[in-house]
Amino acid sequence: MTVTIVGLGLIGGSAARDLARTGLASVQIGVESDPDHLRTALQLGLIDRELALAEAVTAADLIILAIPVDAILRILPDVLDRITDRQTVVDMGSTK
């Protein structure tokens, strides 16, 4: 299963770590605006690669949104326009 994680901070990074440990995801794709979070996730092996949001959503079986709720509301229409009935979107949004 290919998993895209949008947001690699505390929540998204923890989800990526646990998915990597269990082997449930064959490929993990990260979408992250903070270059330090992205670099750390790649160095720790939490994600296999980074893609832009549109590409990452299209490539995934499971999309995890782990960003603040206001940011989810901004990107959700684009995400939902790109998914098929074979993909799942999970909201792990946090308020800040």
Regions found by a protein language model. Name each.
Residues 92-96:
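Rossmann-fold NAD(P)-binding glycine/threonine-rich loop
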Residues 53-90:
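Rossmann-like NAD(P)-binding element
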